[in-house]
From Swiss-Prot:
Phylogenetic classification of the source organism: Bacteria, Pseudomonadati, Pseudomonadota, Alphaproteobacteria, Hyphomicrobiales
Function (record text): F(1)F(0) ATP synthase produces ATP from ADP in the presence of a proton or sodium gradient. F-type ATPases consist of two structural domains, F(1) containing the extramembraneous catalytic core and F(0) containing the membrane proton channel, linked together by a central stalk and a peripheral stalk. During catalysis, ATP synthesis in the catalytic domain of F(1) is coupled via a rotary mechanism of the central stalk subunits to proton translocation.
Subunit (UniProt): F-type ATPases have 2 components, F(1) - the catalytic core - and F(0) - the membrane proton channel. F(1) has five subunits: alpha(3), beta(3), gamma(1), delta(1), epsilon(1). F(0) has three main subunits: a(1), b(2) and c(10-14). The alpha and beta chains form an alternating ring which encloses part of the gamma chain. F(1) is attached to F(0) by a central stalk formed by the gamma and epsilon chains, while a peripheral stalk is formed by the delta and b chains.
One GO molecular-function entry: proton-transporting ATP synthase activity, rotational mechanism
InterPro entries membership: ATP_synth_b/b'su_bac/chlpt (IPR002146), ATP_synthase_B_chain (IPR050059)
A Pfam entry, by short name: ATP-synt_B
Main location: membrane
Name under which the protein is recorded: ATP synthase subunit b 2
PANTHER family: ATP SYNTHASE SUBUNIT B (PTHR33445:SF1), ATP SYNTHASE SUBUNIT B', CHLOROPLASTIC (PTHR33445)
Locations listed in the record: Cell inner membrane
Amino acid sequence: MLVSNVYAQTSEALRERVENALEHADRVFPPFDFSHFCSHFFWLVISFGFFYFFIARVIVPRIGCTIEIRRDRIASDLDRAMRLKQEADTVVEIYERKLAEARLQAYAIAQKTSNEIKEKTKLERKEIETSLDKKLADAEGQIAKIRNKAVQNIGSIAEEVVPEIVKKLIGVEVSKESVSLAVKAADN
């Protein structure tokens, strides 16, 4: 057999469809059938009328209400933002004024402290200089006393040492009286 069962069944279904299409071939597609134009137009007007009233009475008021609420919210937000901006500007102005005052106070305190330190330093320097001058004068006085004592003692030391030095260097013995007369003559 050249034709299979599946092909035969398919061609049977195809044949039925073709016959059915031929039956309805003389008919017009209902929306394009002008014999029913009045009823189609009637239902079109009713449908669009219903949609118009539904949109006009339900949708548009809701949208309008939403837009109005949003506009009011935006206006209140803008007013609030302006108020907050003014408050912030006021706070910034107060902050800058207080900062300037604090800077001036800090500068005044620094100047005052600097002047006090300079005065204290001057006083301490004068006290130290006075103390050092006094100590220097005392030291010079002590040096003068020591020098005078040393000068006075030089004569007695010379009287003791010179006879021995002369004896060792020259080998001659010198009397203490002649050394004493020579030292006294050198002092005058």
